[in-house]
């Protein structure tokens, strides 16, 4: 842009973690400016890691990602914020074409995705963490890979938000030591041609990765958490729940964790896109050719069994085996109304995506398919996610996940060792019942979001704002009206889409 200064600036999009602008120069050239929001993660690491990840994928693995022209990992610049200037890719999002694609085009796209993922799976990273350019990290916190790329601390926002940024927790990696210093070590060995001979790049072990979220949350809870009532939608309590209930479950998980580790290539450090949604895949206009994969913010390198799974756009139910039956539209599809056709087509396309992604992965990325075959992989990954959620007096899903994984019929497929954690039959039944209530509550809340056309955090498009506000007000009042006697105030107070400062009382029935 320097050749034609003072570009025209227009906002392209704004989400919870980024603001995206188009910069247009007088000569017609356009670039994308991406500015992270304060809640995106640690300012320096978030920007530096996203830039390095895109540069690595483009330069080393030759994958189609936007070219980075310039960036700043500090707000001490004329812009007053961290930023990334990158290529604007002239493509159509997969989301805009999703329901109009032919089956052959869906197959082609799934093959391309599987082949790109294979290139990433095939690269032998020496440790776990996030990618950076060498110049963007202190020398003590980096493991060299290739060219000027290094692995450094995990940039994921979960490890930095709130009190976590001030708490000593494992974020990885790393130290680099002479080979002679460590005759044996749990970790990955990386041979680097240097002036002093071979070195070992030591990152977090697989067990460190599996337990890091639990240990992180235990550290924060022990220092900062206080008893509080559960404020979950439709499942609130009018009594305090003590943080020790959370840490006790995390302690039980730490006993289980060593048995979840998979040997050899199953634990290989693997990079994966953090959110491969339809909107993050760009196609060449009018074709099924993928020309860019965007939004690599928060991408990390973790053990393969933690990274394996279906892309976000598949909405795959990991608790169920993938059907090998070729999906088809109902015989009376042409007689349906437009809205019903759209709903049926969306389900049909989802079934196609799951089937053909599975097939493409089996043919083009055998390493990934082998991991997907791990018994109860979905249950294990679900448990790992639950250990990373912050204290909010809601431990329903963490308890249910532990109960599920330690069920004898499940545990026997995971480990040949005796399960180190036991629950009584009464505890199991109570946990399952509570989890079912939670799921029913979440399904209702999902219908509320769909009705209001809002996202998980209550955000919506500007032209839907007034409608969503009024609809939200009416639904909140209706919920109180239908609440049991004595529950109206709790229901009103725990409505999920209200201002934090809203301390009002419910209207009288």
Curated annotation (Swiss-Prot):
Q: Does the keyword Kinase apply?
A: no
Induced by what? Expression is regulated by the hypoxia responsive morphology factor A (hrmA).
Q: Which InterPro entries match?
A: Aminoglycoside_PTrfase, Kinase-like_dom_sf, Mito_inheritance_9
Q: Which GO terms describe its biological process?
A: cell adhesion
- UniProt KW keywords: Cell adhesion, Virulence
Recorded hits in Pfam families, A to Z, give:
APH
CDD domains, A to Z:
APH_ChoK_like
The keyword Signal is annotated on this UniProt entry:
no
What is known about what this protein does? Answer: Part of the subtelomeric hrmA-associated cluster (HAC) containing genes that alter the hyphal surface (such as reduced total chitin or increased beta-glucan exposure) and perturb inter-hyphal interactions within the developing biofilms, resulting in a loss of vertically aligned polarized growing filaments. Consequently, this hypoxia-typic morphotype (called H-MORPH) with altered biofilm architecture leads to increased hypoxia fitness, increased host inflammation, rapid disease progression, and mortality in a murine model of invasive aspergillosis.
Q: What is this protein called?
A: Subtelomeric hrmA-associated cluster protein AFUB_078990
**Native source species:** Aspergillus fumigatus (strain CBS 144.89 / FGSC A1163 / CEA10) (Neosartorya fumigata)
């Amino acid at each position: 842009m320097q050749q034609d200064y003072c570009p025209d600036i227009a906002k392209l999009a704004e989400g919870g973690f980024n603001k995206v602008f188009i910069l247009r120069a007088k000569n017609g050239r356009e670039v994308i400016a991406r500015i992270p929001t304060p809640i995106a993660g640690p300012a320096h690491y978030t920007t530096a890691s996203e830039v390095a990840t895109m540069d690595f994928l483009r330069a080393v693995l030759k994958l189609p990602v936007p070219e980075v022209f310039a960036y700043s990992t500090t707000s001490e610049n004329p812009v007053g914020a961290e930023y990334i200037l990158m290529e604007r890719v002239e493509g159509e999002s997969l989301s805009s074409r999703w329901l109009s694609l032919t089956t052959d085009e869906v197959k082609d796209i799934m093959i391309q995705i599987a082949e790109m993922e294979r290139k990433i799976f095939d690269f032998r990273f020496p440790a776990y963490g996030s990618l950076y350019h060498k110049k963007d990290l202190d020398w003590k916190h980096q493991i060299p890979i290739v060219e000027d790329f290094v692995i450094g601390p995990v940039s994921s926002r979960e490890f930095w938000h709130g009190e976590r940024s001030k708490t000593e927790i494992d974020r990885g990696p790393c130290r680099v030591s002479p080979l002679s210093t460590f005759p044996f070590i749990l970790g990955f060995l990386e041979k680097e041609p240097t002036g002093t001979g071979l070195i070992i790049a030591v990152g977090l072990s697989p067990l460190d990765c599996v337990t890091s979220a639990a240990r992180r949350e235990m550290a924060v809870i022990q220092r900062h958490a206080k008893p509080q009532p559960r404020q979950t939608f439709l499942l609130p309590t009018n009594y305090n729940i003590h943080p020790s209930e959370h840490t006790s479950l995390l302690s039980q998980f730490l006993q289980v964790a060593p048995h979840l580790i998979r040997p050899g290539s199953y634990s290989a450090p693997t990079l994966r896109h953090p959110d491969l949604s339809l909107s993050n895949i760009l196609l060449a206009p009018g074709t099924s050719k993928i020309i860019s994969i965007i939004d690599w913010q928060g991408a990390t390198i973790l053990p393969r069994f933690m990274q394996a799974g279906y892309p976000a756009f598949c909405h795959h139910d990991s608790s169920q085996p993938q059907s090998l039956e070729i999906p088809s539209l109902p015989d009376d599809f042409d007689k349906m109304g437009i809205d019903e056709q759209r709903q049926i087509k969306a389900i049909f396309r989802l079934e196609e995506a799951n089937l053909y992604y599975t097939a493409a992965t089996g043919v083009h990325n055998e390493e990934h398919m082998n991991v997907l075959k791990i018994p109860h992989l979905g249950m294990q990954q679900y448990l790992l996610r639950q250990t990373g959620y912050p204290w909010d007096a809601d431990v329903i899903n963490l308890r249910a996940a532990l109960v599920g994984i330690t069920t004898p019929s499940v545990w026997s497929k995971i480990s040949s060792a005796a399960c180190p954690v036991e629950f009584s039959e009464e505890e199991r039944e109570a946990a399952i019942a509570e989890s079912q209530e939670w799921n029913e509550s979440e399904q209702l809340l999902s219908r509320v979001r769909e009705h209001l056309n809002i996202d998980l955090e209550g955000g919506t498009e500007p032209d839907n704002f007034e409608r969503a506000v009024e609809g939200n007000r009416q639904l909140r009042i209706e919920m109180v009206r239908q609440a049991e006697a004595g529950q109206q105030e709790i229901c009103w107070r725990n409505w999920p889409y209200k201002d934090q400062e809203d301390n009002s009382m419910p209207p009288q029935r």
